[in-house]
Regions:
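Conserved alpha/beta cores of soluble small-molecule-handling proteins
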Residues: 1-200
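Basic polycationic patches enriched in arginine
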Residues: 211-213
Length: 218
């Protein structure tokens, strides 16, 4: 499948402090965008990273047909870019897609598209020890419709973030005894958006470390 490339007019890389990288706050110049409609994958484009415009009735906002993956690219001693297990990430991504009634993304879009994207944005892969390029493939339903049924159109996107360590200090472990994320027969194995949104209530955040807990009978 042909990939159309629309290069950015001026890179934003000089705006990033690669010596002090936060996780998930800086984004590389380009993103890969593929569209699914009429039962097949259509146009595939690499374009400047930027906003997307959708209608309020877009189905993924209401019914949760949204999945994602995460992997990392590293700069080797020789300067090459190496990605850890991209084929396995693609398999898991498509397993999530099947569970959420979404189309699988073919290898020529997922892997070949990623390879082309990394080649274009290779300057964004950090060389500093402990840093990497976080790669985020994701897909979401785009039909404009209010009703519980699988969408007929989807968007698949890959964007990249130069990152430092995910955690800035050692972890403290808390065992949750009241709330669960997964249940037998459910979607706990899938990397769908709802699996992570439901965790926020049980995860203390800097904004609300003393949040109240809902009664277990609620």
């Amino acid at each position: 499948m042909q990939i159309h490339i629309e290069p950015i007019s001026k890179s934003r890389i000089d705006q990033v402090d690669f010596d002090h990288l936060a996780f998930g706050r800086s984004f590389a110049d380009h993103m890969l965008v593929a569209e699914y409609a009429d039962g097949a994958w259509q146009k595939v484009t690499i374009q400047p990273y930027g906003p997307l415009e959708y209608q309020p009735a877009m189905m993924s906002l209401h019914y949760g047909q949204a999945i994602f993956e995460g992997m990392k690219g590293y700069r080797s001693v020789s300067g090459d870019i190496q990605v850890f297990r991209p084929e396995e990430n693609m398999k898991r991504f498509n397993k999530s897609a099947t569970r959420m009634c979404m189309p699988e993304v073919p290898k020529e879009i997922f892997l070949d598209g990623l390879r082309t994207l990394l080649k274009l944005d290779q300057a964004w892969v950090p060389a500093k020890e402990g840093c990497s390029l976080y790669i985020r493939p994701f897909m979401f339903a785009t039909d404009e419709y209010v009703g519980v049924t699988p969408s007929t159109t989807y968007k698949f996107i890959i964007f990249n973030c130069p990152v430092g360590s995910y955690y800035s200090k050692p972890l403290r472990v808390r065992v949750e005894t009241e709330f669960i994320r997964a249940a037998k027969g459910g979607v706990g194995f899938a990397k769908n958006a709802g699996n992570y949104g439901c965790l926020l209530y049980t995860s203390p955040s800097p904004r609300d470390t003393e949040r109240s807990r809902m009664p277990s009978s609620a």
